[in-house]
Amino acid sequence: MPKHSKRYLEARKLVDRTKYYDLDEAIELVKKTATAKFDETIELHIQTGIDYRKPEQHIRGTIVLPHGTGKEVKVLVFAKGEKAKEALEAGADYVGAEDLVEKIEKEGFLDFDVAIATPDMMRIIGRLGKILGPRGLMPSPKSGTVTQEVAEAVKEFKKGRIEVRTDKTGNIHIPVGKRSFDNEKLKENIIAAIKQIMQMKPAGVKGQFIKKAVLSSTMGPGIKLNLQSLLKE
């Protein structure tokens, strides 16, 4: 059993672990349990009913949070010529081609949150799969990060589009804001996330798709959400 900090144990006393909370109450409570000295991220954890043994049921895509995550997103773009210029003008932090591939390979450069590529770049960045893949940074058509529309993609990821995927236990973890967000913004982000995840239900999933949803802060305990009321929002 991992040892929890005194702060965590105090926060856990505020949460009734047998209760499923309505969203408004859960948001109030998650803020009370976020007692660290930094502005903690509020996270939504969704347990899905997918069978992870079946690759066709794996979920990978992007969702848009109306109020963003509260984190400054660093975007890297693999592009050349006019597309490279468009990416820079749209606000990309790093733009390049072979030079960036080399920087990642030889220097271990990973100071970015999202990597976008034009389709013609895939042949030169394919060898980065072993580095970027495990970190969830490899450009992919499924996540909208392999595209000719680089300027639009850069702007969307800067504004609040985030990539989501199921982990090896079929769970999805989504940052939905910061403790400093007002309650209404957190609520709107959470509802938007749930609705968009519902639309990603793979065709082969039988039974209930979203089995459980839990809200927590970076350092705080989990707060179980009342799914019936949440799905009606």
From Swiss-Prot:
Enumerate the CDD domains for this protein: Ribosomal_L1
* Record Gene3D superfamilies: 3.30.190.20, 3.40.50.790
Coiled-coil stretches noted in the UniProt entry, renumbered to this chain:
none
Q: Which InterPro entries match?
A: Ribosom_uL1_bac-type, Ribosomal_uL1, Ribosomal_uL1-like, Ribosomal_uL1/biogenesis, Ribosomal_uL1_3-a/b-sand, Ribosomal_uL1_CS
Q: Which UniProt keywords apply?
A: Repressor, Ribonucleoprotein, Ribosomal protein, RNA-binding, rRNA-binding, Translation regulation, tRNA-binding
**One of the protein's GO biological processes:** regulation of translation
Name of a matching Pfam family? Ribosomal_L1
Entry GO MF terms: rRNA binding; structural constituent of ribosome; tRNA binding
The record's GO CC annotations read: large ribosomal subunit
Q: How does it assemble?
A: Part of the 50S ribosomal subunit.
What this chain does, per the entry, is described as: Binds directly to 23S rRNA. The L1 stalk is quite mobile in the ribosome, and is involved in E site tRNA release. Protein L1 is also a translational repressor protein, it controls the translation of the L11 operon by binding to its mRNA.
Q: Which PANTHER family match?
A: 54S RIBOSOMAL PROTEIN L1, MITOCHONDRIAL, LARGE RIBOSOMAL SUBUNIT PROTEIN UL1M
Could you say which protein family the record assigns here? Belongs to the universal ribosomal protein uL1 family.
Return the protein name: Large ribosomal subunit protein uL1
Q: Which organism is it from?
A: Thermotoga sp. (strain RQ2)
